[in-house]
C-alpha cells in the first residue's frame, strides 16, 4: 500500500500546531513543495527552508504566530491552523469550478489538483477549471 504524502503533510503541520511548536520538518516531494508554496503565499506559514540530510531532502516550515500585546511581557501565540484532508486514495473527490466550496465565506482556502497544477480555489475559479479537492485550510 502506498503512502499518502498529502495526509502526512497535513498531519505533521496539525500536530506541531497543537503542541505549540514553532517549526515542522516534512519530507520534500514535488507535491509537498507545491502545497507549501501555496501555504506560504496565503500567509499560513512564515518561512520555508530546504534541508538535506543523508541524501534525503526535507522542508523545514516555520509556522506563523501573532504577538500578544496584553500583559506585562509581550508573548507570542501561534495562529490556530485547521487543515482537513478531503480527497484521499480510497475516495477521490472532484469538483467543477462552479461547485468548488467556499470555506468560511472565502476566509479559508481549498487546495485543488487541476490539469494546470496545484492551485487554490480562487485561482481555479478565475481560470474556470475544476479538479480534485485535496484539502481545506482555515
UniProtKB/Swiss-Prot annotation:
Q: Where in the cell is it found?
A: Plastid, Chloroplast
Top-level division of the source organism's lineage: Eukaryota
Give the organism's phylogenetic lineage.
Answer: Eukaryota, Viridiplantae, Streptophyta, Embryophyta, Tracheophyta
Please explain the role this protein plays, according to its UniProt record.
Answer: One of the primary rRNA binding proteins, it binds directly to 16S rRNA central domain where it helps coordinate assembly of the platform of the 30S subunit.
**Which PANTHER family does its entry note?**
40S RIBOSOMAL PROTEIN S15A (PTHR11758)
Matching InterPro entries, A to Z? Ribosomal_uS8 (IPR000630), Ribosomal_uS8_CS (IPR047863), Ribosomal_uS8_sf (IPR035987)
Q: Which GO terms describe its biological process?
A: translation
Q: Which Gene3D superfamilies match?
A: 3.30.1370.30, 3.30.1490.10
Q: Does the keyword rRNA-binding apply?
A: yes
Q: Which GO terms describe its cellular component?
A: chloroplast; ribonucleoprotein complex; ribosome
A GO MF label: structural constituent of ribosome
Name this polypeptide is given: Small ribosomal subunit protein uS8c
- Subunit (UniProt): Part of the 30S ribosomal subunit.
What family does the entry list? Answer: Belongs to the universal ribosomal protein uS8 family.
Ordered alphabetically, the record's keywords are: Chloroplast, Plastid, Ribonucleoprotein, Ribosomal protein, RNA-binding, rRNA-binding
Amino acid at each position: 500500500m502506498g503512502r499518502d504524502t498529502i495526509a502526512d503533510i497535513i498531519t505533521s503541520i496539525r500536530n506541531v500546531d497543537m503542541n505549540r511548536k514553532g517549526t515542522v520538518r516534512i519530507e520534500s516531494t514535488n507535491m509537498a513543495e507545491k502545497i507549501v508554496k501555496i501555504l506560504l503565499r496565503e500567509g499560513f506559514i512564515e518561512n520555508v527552508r530546504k534541508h538535506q540530510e543523508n541524501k534525503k531532502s526535507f522542508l523545514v516550515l516555520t509556522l506563523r504566530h501573532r504577538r500578544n500585546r496584553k500583559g506585562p511581557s509581550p508573548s507570542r501565540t501561534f495562529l490556530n491552523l485547521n487543515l482537513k484532508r478531503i480527497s484521499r486514495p480510497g475516495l477521490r473527490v472532484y469538483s467543477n469550478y462552479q461547485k468548488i466550496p467556499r470555506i468560511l465565506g472565502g476566509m479559508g482556502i481549498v487546495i485543488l489538483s487541476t490539469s494546470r497544477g496545484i492551485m487554490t480555489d480562487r485561482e481555479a475559479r478565475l481560470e474556470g477549471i475544476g479538479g480534485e479537492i485535496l484539502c481545506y485550510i482555515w
